[in-house]
Protein backbone atom coordinates (compact mmCIF):
# COMPACT_ATOMS: atom_id res chain seq x y z
CA UNK A 1 0.00 0.00 0.00
CA UNK A 2 1.34 3.42 -0.94
CA UNK A 3 2.04 5.94 1.80
CA UNK A 4 1.22 9.40 0.49
CA UNK A 5 2.33 12.48 2.39
CA UNK A 6 0.91 15.76 1.18
CA UNK A 7 3.18 18.56 2.34
CA UNK A 8 1.36 21.87 2.01
CA UNK A 9 2.00 25.43 3.09
CA UNK A 10 -0.51 26.90 5.54
CA UNK A 11 -3.84 25.76 6.90
CA UNK A 12 -7.17 25.39 5.17
CA UNK A 13 -9.79 27.48 6.97
CA UNK A 14 -12.73 27.46 4.56
CA UNK A 15 -15.30 24.96 5.84
CA UNK A 16 -16.38 23.82 2.39
CA UNK A 17 -12.78 22.95 1.48
CA UNK A 18 -12.18 21.22 4.82
CA UNK A 19 -15.31 19.11 4.23
CA UNK A 20 -14.20 18.16 0.72
CA UNK A 21 -10.68 17.30 1.89
CA UNK A 22 -12.03 15.14 4.71
CA UNK A 23 -14.36 13.35 2.27
CA UNK A 24 -11.56 12.43 -0.12
CA UNK A 25 -9.24 11.41 2.71
CA UNK A 26 -11.99 9.01 3.81
CA UNK A 27 -12.48 7.71 0.25
CA UNK A 28 -8.75 7.11 -0.15
CA UNK A 29 -8.39 4.92 2.97
CA UNK A 30 -8.91 1.58 1.15
CA UNK A 31 -6.24 2.47 -1.42
CA UNK A 32 -3.42 4.31 0.36
CA UNK A 33 -2.30 5.74 3.66
CA UNK A 34 -2.59 9.49 3.26
CA UNK A 35 -1.54 12.21 5.64
CA UNK A 36 -1.34 15.96 5.27
CA UNK A 37 1.49 17.88 6.90
CA UNK A 38 1.39 21.67 7.03
CA UNK A 39 4.43 23.92 6.78
CA UNK A 40 4.21 27.43 8.23
CA UNK A 41 2.87 30.06 5.84
CA UNK A 42 4.61 33.41 5.67
CA UNK A 43 2.64 36.62 5.48
CA UNK A 44 2.87 38.07 1.96
CA UNK A 45 2.64 41.86 1.61
CA UNK A 46 0.46 43.31 -1.16
CA UNK A 47 3.44 44.23 -3.32
CA UNK A 48 6.50 42.30 -2.16
CA UNK A 49 9.89 43.21 -3.59
CA UNK A 50 11.77 40.53 -5.56
CA UNK A 51 14.06 40.08 -2.53
CA UNK A 52 10.99 39.79 -0.29
CA UNK A 53 9.51 37.12 -2.56
CA UNK A 54 12.75 35.12 -2.43
CA UNK A 55 12.91 35.45 1.35
CA UNK A 56 9.32 34.20 1.75
CA UNK A 57 9.87 31.30 -0.67
CA UNK A 58 13.09 30.33 1.11
CA UNK A 59 11.43 30.38 4.52
CA UNK A 60 8.44 28.34 3.37
CA UNK A 61 10.81 26.03 1.49
CA UNK A 62 12.78 25.29 4.65
CA UNK A 63 9.52 24.45 6.41
CA UNK A 64 8.50 22.15 3.56
CA UNK A 65 11.92 20.49 3.50
CA UNK A 66 11.67 19.54 7.17
CA UNK A 67 8.39 17.72 6.52
CA UNK A 68 9.33 15.64 3.47
CA UNK A 69 9.85 12.04 4.60
CA UNK A 70 13.40 10.81 3.94
CA UNK A 71 13.81 8.57 0.88
CA UNK A 72 10.36 9.44 -0.44
CA UNK A 73 9.69 9.95 -4.14
CA UNK A 74 8.89 13.66 -4.24
CA UNK A 75 6.35 15.29 -6.52
CA UNK A 76 6.28 19.09 -6.57
CA UNK A 77 3.08 20.62 -7.88
CA UNK A 78 4.28 23.29 -10.28
CA UNK A 79 2.47 25.18 -13.03
CA UNK A 80 5.52 24.67 -15.26
CA UNK A 81 5.72 20.92 -14.61
CA UNK A 82 4.68 18.01 -16.80
CA UNK A 83 0.95 17.55 -17.38
CA UNK A 84 -0.47 14.05 -17.08
CA UNK A 85 -3.91 12.69 -17.82
CA UNK A 86 -5.75 10.92 -14.99
CA UNK A 87 -4.85 7.60 -16.62
CA UNK A 88 -1.18 8.58 -16.82
CA UNK A 89 -1.16 9.58 -13.15
CA UNK A 90 -2.71 6.21 -12.28
CA UNK A 91 0.05 4.53 -14.27
CA UNK A 92 2.82 6.54 -12.60
CA UNK A 93 1.51 5.66 -9.13
CA UNK A 94 1.29 1.98 -10.09
CA UNK A 95 4.84 2.09 -11.49
CA UNK A 96 6.14 3.61 -8.25
CA UNK A 97 4.49 0.86 -6.21
CA UNK A 98 5.92 -1.84 -8.51
CA UNK A 99 9.38 -0.29 -8.18
CA UNK A 100 9.08 -0.54 -4.38
CA UNK A 101 8.81 3.21 -3.91
CA UNK A 102 5.96 3.09 -1.43
CA UNK A 103 6.62 6.48 0.15
CA UNK A 104 5.50 9.41 -2.01
CA UNK A 105 5.53 13.06 -0.95
CA UNK A 106 3.36 15.51 -2.89
CA UNK A 107 4.31 19.14 -2.30
CA UNK A 108 1.96 22.12 -2.59
CA UNK A 109 3.51 25.56 -2.28
CA UNK A 110 2.04 28.69 -0.79
CA UNK A 111 0.71 31.88 -2.34
CA UNK A 112 3.98 32.54 -4.19
CA UNK A 113 4.61 28.94 -5.22
CA UNK A 114 7.66 26.86 -4.33
CA UNK A 115 11.28 27.77 -3.72
CA UNK A 116 13.66 26.89 -6.54
CA UNK A 117 15.59 24.48 -4.31
CA UNK A 118 12.40 22.51 -3.58
CA UNK A 119 11.61 22.30 -7.30
CA UNK A 120 15.16 21.18 -8.07
CA UNK A 121 15.07 18.44 -5.43
CA UNK A 122 11.77 17.02 -6.69
CA UNK A 123 11.77 13.71 -8.56
CA UNK A 124 8.80 14.94 -10.60
CA UNK A 125 7.35 18.38 -11.23
CA UNK A 126 3.65 17.90 -11.91
CA UNK A 127 1.26 20.47 -13.36
CA UNK A 128 -2.50 20.19 -13.14
CA UNK A 129 -2.98 23.18 -15.43
CA UNK A 130 -1.27 26.31 -16.64
CA UNK A 131 -3.84 28.15 -14.53
CA UNK A 132 -2.94 29.30 -11.04
CA UNK A 133 -5.12 27.79 -8.30
CA UNK A 134 -5.41 28.86 -4.67
CA UNK A 135 -3.09 26.55 -2.74
CA UNK A 136 -5.88 25.56 -0.32
CA UNK A 137 -8.11 24.47 -3.22
CA UNK A 138 -5.20 22.55 -4.75
CA UNK A 139 -5.28 20.13 -1.82
CA UNK A 140 -8.83 19.14 -2.68
CA UNK A 141 -8.07 18.87 -6.41
CA UNK A 142 -5.00 16.72 -5.68
CA UNK A 143 -6.91 14.38 -3.36
CA UNK A 144 -9.68 13.96 -5.93
CA UNK A 145 -7.17 13.10 -8.65
CA UNK A 146 -5.40 10.60 -6.39
CA UNK A 147 -8.74 8.95 -5.64
CA UNK A 148 -9.57 8.89 -9.35
CA UNK A 149 -6.16 7.35 -10.10
CA UNK A 150 -6.71 4.49 -7.67
CA UNK A 151 -10.19 3.85 -9.06
CA UNK A 152 -8.70 3.73 -12.59
CA UNK A 153 -5.97 1.32 -11.44
CA UNK A 154 -8.58 -1.08 -10.08
CA UNK A 155 -11.03 -0.70 -12.94
CA UNK A 156 -13.70 0.51 -10.53
CA UNK A 157 -16.50 2.82 -11.59
CA UNK A 158 -15.96 6.53 -10.95
CA UNK A 159 -13.78 7.71 -13.80
CA UNK A 160 -15.67 8.79 -16.92
Curated annotation (Swiss-Prot):
EC class of the enzyme, as a word: transferase
Major site of localization recorded for this protein: cytoplasm
Location of this chain's protein in the cell: Cytoplasm
Biological role stated in the UniProt entry: Specifically methylates the pseudouridine at position 1915 (m3Psi1915) in 23S rRNA.
Keywords, comma-separated and alphabetical: Cytoplasm, Methyltransferase, rRNA processing, S-adenosyl-L-methionine, Transferase
NCBIfam families attached to this UniProt entry: PRK00103.1-3
UniProt-annotated binding residues for S-adenosyl-L-methionine: 77, 109
Protein name per UniProt: Ribosomal RNA large subunit methyltransferase H
GO molecular function, one term: rRNA (pseudouridine-N3-)-methyltransferase activity
Oligomeric and partner information: Homodimer.
SUPFAM superfamilies: alpha/beta knot (SSF75217)
Gene field: rlmH
Record family assignment: Belongs to the RNA methyltransferase RlmH family.
Xref: InterPro entries: Alpha/beta_knot_MTases, RlmH-like, tRNA_m1G_MTases_N
GO cellular component, one term: cytoplasm
Reactions the enzyme catalyzes: pseudouridine(1915) in 23S rRNA + S-adenosyl-L-methionine = N(3)-methylpseudouridine(1915) in 23S rRNA + S-adenosyl-L-homocysteine + H(+)
Entry-linked Pfam families: SPOUT_MTase
E.C. designation(s): 2.1.1.177
Species classification: Bacteria, Bacillati, Bacillota, Clostridia, Moorellales
